[in-house]
């Protein structure tokens, strides 16, 4: 199938550009695409040339490329230093160490309460309990309430494939999350004739389990199966497992994240000797919440007080999880947070409106845009290649580009975008991938051999082969990185991305952290103390600095 390509105006069609265009079209036409539809656009951010255009205005399903819209809107609407807060609240008095009433765990969406950023899965819970103990609380004479009413729901988008709802990438969206709303089933053989032993990691999953499986001495017929038709239904463990079998692991989403959080927090409390006399209850609707639809839970309730509070890492850290790891839960929660910040309602509809308004304010072309979720998992989403390229162009001209660029996966880099690792694109091209059934996409930016910044978006819907689509993306990315203009026609090239200007002061130097460095080494190099560095970097965690991070360094001799 020959793809139609929008040709450049005659004055721009230098021989080098014509050759590039020919090479790109030949790459597309290497394979037969049947009824598949491509949308592609390559645009020079430095010269303003459109180097390739294949149906760039066609609105296609973008898969995870949609995360580019979500994260851009989050940076503009929330800011890179935005934090999620989790509160422990009560309006009850404390007598002899016992809280005389209900205790509420109130979430505002933090998806990072897990071992992703901390030493253990329940470390955030333990820190909250530290604060309760410091307040002298040794017991709770009331209920434990897990309040997730900050977001109104639904837990899952109706456009997500039903067969995927057990998988980690469709974890339920909630204002309260723990362990990214998944548990791992660990199944070990029992005595012959008895059911296998079942546990979940972490425990207290709040999942109903129907274990009818059997441990056998010989071959398993039928083999062990761990099944669930819908997240709200019991997990069924059926079949047989040999007595000499290794343990079997299966990860599944929890049915209701707030139930999971409530059960897990209660277990953490009781593990520290803080007993709860009442039930564990879940609140998901604002109308049922004693906290109410407030952005700051301490406001609006006479006598209500914050007993403990956890503050998340900055949004900029979370955006790297979204774009580099394509984490859907983080994307969905951030999407809802954008809606909540914009209109006071964290529904999918309000959030989509907020994203669109942000894009329009940036001057991004949004014709054909249809957004149903924040992650791109829904097959009902629609975006054009022109919108993605226009977004990259607008972001690259703005003050938040360093944070946005830092969140994108680098080609040839393990655990980011491992493809194109032996090409000119390696450690140069940065782009978001996207894959759902029949859909493949890659959108981002790469520098040519001349250093020219080329924004691109490649999307295909109805692809008969994901492997072929990814191969085409790789070849095009590598070819763009290898592109060189005829001498004398190279446009003025923008400088390499600098760290955010807002984090610099005239009286301080700056240091970019190298691989393996720690604060002690950096302090010695500049002749300052660690505390002096931390004073001018109030958001830096002294126990976690990473390669590529920028630090302000106070100059010796004062201001």
Question: What residue spans do the PLM features occupy?
Answer:
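Primarily a LysM-type cell-wall glycan-binding module
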Residues: 499-535, 547-549, 557-559
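Beta-lactamase-like hydrolase cores
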Residues: 14-59, 131-136
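Small-residue-rich helix-loop
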Residues: 51-54, 325, 332-500
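Bacterial N-terminal signal peptides
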Residues: 1-9
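Residue-level preference for non-acidic, small/hydrophobic
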Residues: 48, 67-74, 144, 176, ...
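Conserved serine DD-peptidase/penicillin-binding transpeptidase domain
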Residues: 15-29, 77-366, 449, 483-486
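Soluble periplasmic/extracytoplasmic beta-strand elements of cell-envelope proteins
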Residues: 39-43, 51-53, 70, 87-89, ...
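Short active-site loop at a secondary-structure junction
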Residues: 53-73
